[in-house]
């Protein structure tokens, strides 16, 4: 709905989804772009794939202009990445944080979340990519069509990637002494319009070309054992095979946990310093893939309020990252070089 800023009177109200049929929640507000109110949402598993949408409404009238489902249906691009999983059983790829907007390119830049359940052996196989979960999507502002996408990882652990994307124009000169993965075809020092920042719970900084989604560079900011490689030329991510769940009741040791790394707390960017600033956590967990939260193993892990996420079929016992006594950090990272300019650590 929209309110008159001068009087507080309601100007229009539009139903986007019937929560009884396509359950979803708004955990962040919309943005206004090109005269449109652009909104994302967290879609509940029981709401089905049609609840997992981004939508655009005329900001003056409330009329729907477009909606973009984030889970492909049969016959659509990306359908094959779900294998044999029926369309109605594809759940929970949400867009529950605030998007960014580039008016020159006419692009809405949005991040997406994990599937439900998270371990992919429950969803037709661990090798399937299950688009468009844990991805950066560039949508045409006028139509909602996907111009390009980049998938940050195939997520088995509820390590969402919906967080803020920073739109920056900067020289791109990643320092090989500081940055783990670099595109070998980069021209160092070239000024480019990029998307940068920490988009997901893994705490990895990604820098992509804004117009094309081309991978430029990426580097971790916390201890993590989830991503073991990124192909610099293609941007393709390799997850750690030793911690990918293969069966129910399997326990793996994962860093970070679904608490992050990074989580809801937003980072910031200063054009004066060309540096981004992020609050982060040093967390790990013994994590269990299970559909039975009454089992002895699940009870032992979650005892004392440690945590179980039934919609993801995960249970966990969280701990500090080995080798540190500080949970919290604030890290300042150069958008040009990827160098850590400074690091503040605190117990909480």
Spans of model-derived segments:
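Aromatic (tryptophan-biased) beta-strands that constitute blades/sheets of beta-rich domains
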Residues: 9-18, 63-71, 76-89, 127, ...
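Glycine-rich, aromatic-lined ligand/substrate-binding cores of catalytic
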Residues: 162, 204, 263-306, 312, ...
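Short, solvent-exposed loop/turn and secondary-structure capping segments
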Residues: 4-5, 15, 23-24, 42, ...
């Amino acid at each position: 709905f929209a309110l008159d800023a001068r009087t507080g009177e309601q100007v229009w109200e539009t139903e986007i989804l019937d929560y009884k049929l396509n359950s979803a929640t708004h955990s962040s507000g919309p943005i206004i772009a090109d005269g449109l109110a652009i909104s994302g949402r967290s879609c509940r598993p029981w709401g089905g794939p049609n609840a997992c949408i981004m939508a655009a409404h005329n900001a003056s009238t409330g009329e729907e202009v477009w909606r973009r489902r984030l889970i492909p249906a049969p016959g659509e691009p990306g359908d094959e990445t779900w294998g044999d999983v029926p369309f109605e059983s594809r759940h929970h790829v949400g867009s529950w944080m605030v998007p960014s907007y580039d008016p020159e390119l006419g692009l809405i830049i949005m991040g997406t979340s994990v599937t439900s359940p998270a371990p992919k052996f429950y969803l037709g196989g661990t090798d399937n990519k299950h688009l468009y979960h844990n991805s950066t999507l560039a949508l045409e502002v006028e139509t909602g069509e996907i111009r390009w996408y980049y998938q940050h990882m195939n997520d088995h652990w509820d390590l969402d990637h919906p967080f803020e994307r920073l739109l920056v124009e900067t020289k791109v000169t990643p320092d090989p002494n500081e940055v783990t993965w670099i595109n070998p075809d980069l021209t160092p020092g070239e000024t480019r319009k990029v998307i940068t920042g920490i988009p997901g719970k893994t705490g990895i900084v990604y820098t992509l070309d804004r117009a094309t989604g081309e991978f430029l560079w990426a580097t971790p900011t916390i201890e993590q054992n989830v991503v073991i490689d990124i192909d610099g030329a293609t941007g393709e991510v390799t997850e750690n095979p030793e911690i990918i769940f293969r069966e129910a009741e399997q326990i793996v040791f994962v860093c970070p946990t679904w608490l992050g790394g990074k989580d809801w707390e937003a980072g910031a960017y200063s054009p004066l310093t060309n540096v981004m600033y992020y609050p982060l956590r040093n967390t790990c967990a013994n994590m269990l893939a299970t559909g039975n939260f009454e089992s002895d193993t699940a009870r032992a892990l979650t005892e004392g309020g440690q945590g179980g996420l039934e919609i993801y079929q995960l249970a966990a016992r969280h701990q500090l990252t080995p080798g540190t006594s500080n949970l919290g950090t604030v890290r300042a990272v150069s958008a040009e070089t990827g160098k850590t300019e400074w690091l503040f650590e605190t117990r909480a």
